[in-house]
Curated annotation (Swiss-Prot):
Annotated GO CC locations: acetolactate synthase complex
Any one GO molecular function term: acetolactate synthase activity
Family named by the database record: Belongs to the TPP enzyme family.
Entry cofactors: Mg(2+); thiamine diphosphate
PROSITE patterns recorded: TPP_ENZYMES
GO biological process entries: isoleucine biosynthetic process; L-valine biosynthetic process
Record's miscellaneous remark: Contains 1 molecule of FAD per monomer. The role of this cofactor is not clear considering that the reaction does not involve redox chemistry.
Entry note: cofactor: Binds 1 Mg(2+) ion per subunit. Binds 1 thiamine pyrophosphate per subunit.
Stretches for region Thiamine pyrophosphate binding: 394-474
Pathway this chain belongs to: Amino-acid biosynthesis; L-isoleucine biosynthesis; L-isoleucine from 2-oxobutanoate: step 1/4; Amino-acid biosynthesis; L-valine biosynthesis; L-valine from pyruvate: step 1/4
Protein name, per record: Acetolactate synthase large subunit
Amino acid sequence: MEILSGAEMVVRSLIDQGIQHIFGYPGGAVLDIYDALKTVGGIEHILVRHEQAATHMADGYSRSTGKTGVVLVTSGPGATNAITGIATAYMDSIPMVVISGQVASSLIGYDAFQECDMIGISRPIVKHSFLVKKTEDIPIVFKKAFWLASSGRPGPIVIDLPKDILKKDNKYLYKWPDNINIRSYNPTTKGHIGQIKKALHTLLKAQRPVIYAGGGIISSNSSEELRIFAEKINCPVTTSLMGLGSFPGTHDQNISMLGMHGTYEANMTMHHADVIFAIGVRFDDRTTNNLNKYCPNAIVLHVDIDPTSISKTVSANIPIVGDAKHVLQKMIELLKKEKKISLLEDWWNTIKKWKKINSLQYNQLSNKIKPQTVIKTLFKLTKGTSYITSDVGQHQMFTALYYPFNKPRRWINSGGLGTMGFGLPAALGVKLALPKETVICITGDGSIQMNIQELSTARQYNLAVLILNLNNSSLGMVKQWQDMIYSGRHSHSYMDSLPDFVKLSESYGHFGIQITEPIELEEKLMLALSKLSDGHLVFVDVQIDNSEHVYPMQIQGGGMNEMRLRKKEVA
C-alpha cells in the first residue's frame, strides 16, 4: 500500500490493470496526470495530433488484440473532440476507456474555462460513465470501468476527473481492489441449455439453413468453434461487414458478405433460407433492407450476449442470450449424439447456381486502374496475412468484397457509425500493438484528409504502415448514390484542389509512390511492400477509375433478393 495523489493513482491504476499504452493529448485539466506519467513511469503514452485520432488509435489497438484501448484527453474541446471516436467504438462494441479531465469540482456548472458536461454529452454513446468526486475512489472506479468495458457486450466507458481530486497535495492510501461487485450488472454468458437444444434441433431439420455470423464471433474469440460447427453440419456461412474473418474467407462453405453490397449468392441464400442461425449479429439496416420483405420463410435462431439486441429489429423464433463461444461449444458437444446429419446437397446445388451469376465480375481489360484490381493484387502480394484497416466509402466495400479474410481481427473498419478518418489512426494503433505485423490502411482521397495530420504521429513513433489511397478525386460513395438515386446530379461530391499526396507524405519524412497506369500496379505495390518491410511508412496514391461503382447493390426498400448487378462492360 502507498500514499499517492489522485494523478498518481490514475497512473498506478492503469499499471495494475495491465495497461502498457495510452493515447492522448495534454491540457490544463490533466497536467497532473501527465506529470505522473513522467514521474511514476511504466506506461508508454502516444502523443496524437488530434483527440479524435487518439480514440481511433485506441480502437484499432483494441480490435486487433481484444484488449481494452485507453484514451486520455483534457476538458472542454479535448473531451468533445473525442466524441466521434467514442461513438465509433460504441456502435461496433469495442472496449475502450476514455479518461477526460474536468474543471475543479467547485466550478462545475458555472461555465468555467474549458468546462463541458462530458457525462451528459457522452451518455447516449457509452456503456457507462463515471464522474469521480473523491480521490480515494479512483482505484475502484478504474477497476469497475475496465470490467464494464470488456465484459458482456463490450463498449466504451468515460471516466471524468475533476482537476482538484488530482492535485499533488491531496494524497490518500492507494489499494488496487482484488474484486468488484456491481449489483445491477451481471451479464449472461451461458446460454439456456433448453434453448440451445431446441435451436440445434431446428437447424438440423432445416432443408435450406444458413449461418449468419457477425462481429460477436470475433469479440468472443469463437472463430474456431464456428468453423468446426459449420463444417460438421455442412451449412453455408455468410457474414456481416463486422463479421469478416470470423469464418475463413476462402473456405468452400463461405458464401461471402451479405447486405447492401453483399454478394448475389449471400443475399439470395438469406432470402430463400428456411432457418437462419444468426450469431453475434444485431440485424442492422445495412443487412436487412426492408424488414417487411426480410427473409419471409425463415425461422430465426438468434444468439447474442446482449439481450436488448435480440428481436430488436428481426423477431427471433428461438432467442438465446449468451456468449457465442459457450453456445457453439455446447452445440458441438450435442452434435456428437447425432447419428445422421444431412449434407444439404440440393441446397448447395441451388447456391452454386447463384454463384455462377458471378456478381463480383467487372471489366478487367480497362485502360484505367480498377479499384477491384488494386485490392485483388494486394491480396495476391500479401497472401491475405496483413492487418487491414479501412476508412469509409467505396474503398471500404471493395476491400470487403475482394480481399478474403481468413482470420479474425485482421479486418478493422468503422461498420456501425461509418466514420471517415478512422483508417489511418486505427492502423497506427494496430501497428503499436503488433509491431511485427504488416499493417495496411486502405483509404480514399476524401477520408484520408480527415486525419492526415497523424502522419506526424507515425513519424514521431516510427510506426511503419502502408497507406493505400484509392484516389478518384471524388466522394465515391456519395457520387454513386447521386448517380443511382438523384439522376446523376453530382452536388458537391467532387474533390478539387487535392494535394500532391506523394509530396505531402515526403514532407512528413515518409516514402511516397504514385500509380497511374494498370501496367505498373503490381510492380509498384511490390516496391511499396518492400519499403514497408524496411521500416518505412509508405503512402501509395493510386489514380483509379472514378466512374467505378460498387456492385452488387440492394434496391432501396426491397427484399434481400432485390439487387442491382453490374452490367456487362465492353473493354
